[in-house]
């Protein structure tokens, strides 16, 4: 007996050890899953956080002295190794920044006795001098890299044109001029000491004939402007007279006044100090004497282009001058006390604020890659290293409407790439987040009724024999790859919807309504006839009726289209301002709903079928009808599982990639129109991440999109579990 008790104790110890090992394994698995989720979140956050960091500057990265006096222009190469200085005498000197004591490595006299200087819009690198004889010299200093010799031999490229560059004579010298250095149609506008403003340009001729040179003299009303700016294409000229701006455009071989604008907008305390072109020359930066900087660009109003005030930057009155970025839509502001600020116009973000100098430099310029800022003051050149990688990103630019260049009003826009170096990045996450919600909503609108109602019928009403066929068949649908579903939806189903739109619309309304009507008619059939059909086989009788209704719908659709839509439903919708795309939200909703139905159906059906039999039997025994038992007993008991099924389907729909990618036009639209396309977060990540530059704003924003998807899915699942637990506790007593 004692030996038997000892044996039982041994078994209890083994069982206890096994229980502890299994408990440890299960706990470790759960903790491992949570740890993996936390690591994913931390990694995504580490990639995203730099987007919202401030810019940094190292003011004295490289320094060297010069003996040329106040220069006309300065610049530095993309490696801060070579700089040039354009002197007042018209000589350009290339200086090595690596060897501060070394004399100029290359010099060239570009003009003799220059009397006027000008430079092109930011980022283009063209400069111009007019000598005392009225001859214009337009050139572009370059830093050419020769890797084989490990040197960067400088080169000054002159404008190649056969246009006469002699603008005036010595008796009436040029006081200011502007130019566009297009090799096809260069344009020069100048003002002489007498105050006259003239222009000269070349226009292309047809059939290969040499370009025609055109001289144009402005009328007396344009005499002596204080400042002139010309866009790089030579088509738009700005003349500033005090705080008044005259906008002229080139047409019919002359400049004509498009509009005259009061830059103070009626407030005299905002008098204008100077104007500058932003990179790309689409925007105008107006510096006011009170330190305010305003941005203006052309918008389309009443079918006419007009220069419109867009936004203001309230800077201090100690502002000395602005320096626009070379390619991006930002600018640097220099103050008399040496403070340096940098703003980005699109995001309205202050990206840099630092007391970088003892006093404001007399002159400043940016390298072409915008990594180095060169300044001149007191015969000293200083190069500062600038780390300003993500100026275009701010919370407001991501989630609020932004007024982009050329747009008539503020909008939500996602456009990450362009062929232009001066492209204004449009990084609003709202359109792609909206597209994600839109796709998920239409998918759930299609899948939830079919899946939940199908699960109810299969689990509660269907005969066991039919259930053994139907349930595995629907579960088998989940094994279909979504890429195949998306492929069929985009290349096969979308053209069918386009060609038979009216038929699809009719079916969406006719099938649900006719099914309910058939249910009502079935109740009118005598009980003796209904009893001949075994319980659970009603769906089999409904199938021929559905096929018949589909045939009738296809047959009457052309008549409906002819009667109500003038014979072409797509044209009718277009004429009434409703857009139509072949790959649209309707196709996505049907295709993605097809993919989501098995998930919702399986979980909901299992929840309903698992309701204890004694609950429904007790309800029926107390006199309740099967329908009352279903509503008040079965569905209440199974409601936690049904809710979880719907939330799981929602999570699947939100994260779906291939169906949305292949079945839509992938266009980031902000429209609830079911007949237009969309772009989702997941599809954007799949398409753009392989082509994005690692570490760029675009790259990190795609990780932010991934984090949004991750957090949303986690929140949906957490909410589903919370609601499921509460519903289970509420109906536990049933």
Spans of model-derived segments:
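Transmembrane-helix boundary motif in ABC transporter permease subunits
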Residues: 443-474, 518-527, 720-729
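Transmembrane alpha-helices
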Residues: 600-603, 611, 626-661
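Periplasmic/extracellular loop-to-transmembrane helix junction in inner-membrane transport proteins
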Residues: 13-20, 51-90, 94-123, 128-130, ...
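C-terminal transmembrane helix and the adjacent membrane-cytosol boundary/short C-terminal tail
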Residues: 517-528, 605, 609, 613, ...
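Interhelical loop and adjacent transmembrane-helix boundary motif
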Residues: 660-710
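Structural motif
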Residues: 89-95, 133-140, 148, 192-203, ...
